[in-house]
Amino acid sequence: MDHLERSGAEEIEALHGSETMPTLLPGAAFFLGMSYPPAREMIRAGLGVALASDYNPGSSPSGNMRMVVALASIRMRMTPAEAIHAATLNGAYAMGLSDRFGSITPGKTANFFLTRPMPSVEFFSYAYQTPLIDRVFLRGEACGGAVPA
């Protein structure tokens, strides 16, 4: 379930106890000038949340997941660790793929990236324009060469 920008206590309560993963789209809220989804309230209520780009030409013309993670941390009050988890494992769960993707776990497909040195995981979210990704791996294999700085 996505586009939850206007969710309140009643909607959050309805999601609680279900198998539905609320998928939050901060890029769409940013582009359309809407209020951001209440991620902190959902997390406080015990819900898992996923993050997605909603990449499309009408309401979210960017598939930049670094920006999505940054907006979740900066505008939706998620910690950087929560935002990264929401964009990876919870995103895979929302698509019914968490048994094969979303975390670095034996038996799962190894899709991941390596970063340049950072002082902390928080730096990844808050320095969203700094070129931090060094190498990308899909199915355990490096894609191309090192990412230019």
Q: Model-predicted segments: where are they?
A:
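Active-site-adjacent C-terminal substructures of enzyme catalytic domains
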Residues: 1-100, 128, 142, 148
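C-terminal cap of metal-dependent C-N hydrolases
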Residues: 87-89, 109-149
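Structural signature of the urease/amidohydrolase superfamily beta/alpha-barrel
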Residues: 50-53, 92-93, 98-124
